[in-house]
Amino acid sequence: YQGMCYVTEHWERWIDIFQAMRDQRGAKRNDLWINLTCYVNPSPWFLQWGNSVWMQNSQDIGRLNVKRPSQLDQLLSYRDDRYFDFVKTRAFQFPLAHLYNHDPIYGNTANLAGKMDDDEFRTYLMMMATRGSAFWELYYSYNMMNEGQKWVINADVLHWINDNYETLKHAKLIGQTPAKGTPYGYSAWSGQEGIISVRNPSDEVKEFTFPLDRTIGMPEGLKGLHRTYVWAYRTDEQKAEDTENHLFDYGGQISLSLQPGEVRIWKFSTVPDKEAPALRIVKTTSPTSLTVELNEPVILKDGIFSVSGNEVTATSLSADRRVVTL
C-alpha cells in the first residue's frame, strides 16, 4: 500500500544484517551494542536485535528556558520535556534504559564553553543519569573538559552509574513536564533499593509531593527504608526533612519545598549506611599540608578532621568529593 512494501523489505534486510553481525561474533554475540538512530520508529520490537533506539521526538540539542536562563537549566528542561512527551503524551511503551538521546553535551559547537561550573556540570550529569539510559555517547570537546575538574567529575559520575545501574535501569518519570515549570524527577527501584531524583525547573519556590508506591516503580509492601543523599544542588543539605532519622514505607509519600533550580538525588535502602568512610591514602604535599583520599564521598564539616599535634586551619574538597586537602 502506497509503497509500504518497500519499508517492509527495507527493515527485513536490516534485521538480517543485525542478525549476521551478531552471528559473526559467535560466543561474543551479545557483547555488540547496536544503537538504532535516524528514521527508526521507537518501538520495543527492535530490541530483539538492537540495544537502543533514538527517541526521535527530540533535536540533537535543544534549550527550553523556563525563566531560568543557565545552560544547565535550559538543557535539562528541554530534554526532560521530550521524555514527558515520549512517555506521557505519545504514550510509547518503551523501557527508558534502551532509549537513546544525544546527552551529555559539553562542546564547542554547542556554544557551551565556560557555561557550566563544576557543580552545574555534575548536576547536569547526575540528573540525566537518573533517566536510566544504558548508552551514553560523551559529546565533549576535550579543551573544554579542562575547565575546573570536569574530567574528574565525569569519571566519578560514570563510576556511580556503573555501580548503581541495576537500579537505574528501571527508571520511571514522576511529576509533570518541566515545560510547565512544575517539579519532576525520576524514580528507579530494584529489590530493596531505590534511587529518586527531583528537580524544580522554575524560578519560583515549588512544593512537590509524590507517592511511594507502584506508580513510581516501588515494589509493593517495601518497608523500613533509610534515605541518604547522593547529590544536592542549590539546597541546604542540612534541611530538617532530609536529616530526620525516620524510615519510609510503601504507601507513604514524600513532600518537600524546592528552591528555584534545586535538584536532590536520594538513595533508599532497607540497610542503613552506618559504615564511616575509610582512608585509602594519606600523603604529605608540603611541609604544612596533607592530602587524604577516602573510599566514598564526604561532606566537609568543621572538626571532622584532626591531625595529631597539629591544628587543622583549613580544608578543601576535590571535585570527586573523596580527596580532601588539609
Region roles according to the model:
Residues 288-299:
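A short glycine/threonine-centered beta-strand motif
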Residues 237-248, 310-319:
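Low-complexity "stalk/linker" and mucin-like segments enriched in Ser/Thr/Pro/Ala/Gly
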Residues 282-286:
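Short, solvent-exposed loop/linker segments at the N-terminal edge
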Residues 320-325:
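Aromatic sugar-binding surface patches on proteins
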Residues 297-316:
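Short, surface-exposed alpha-helix to beta-strand junction/turn motifs within ectodomains of secreted
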Residues 14-245, 253-265:
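Active-site-proximal substrate-binding groove within the catalytic cores of carbohydrate-active enzymes
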Residues 1-5:
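Active-site groove signature of glycoside hydrolases
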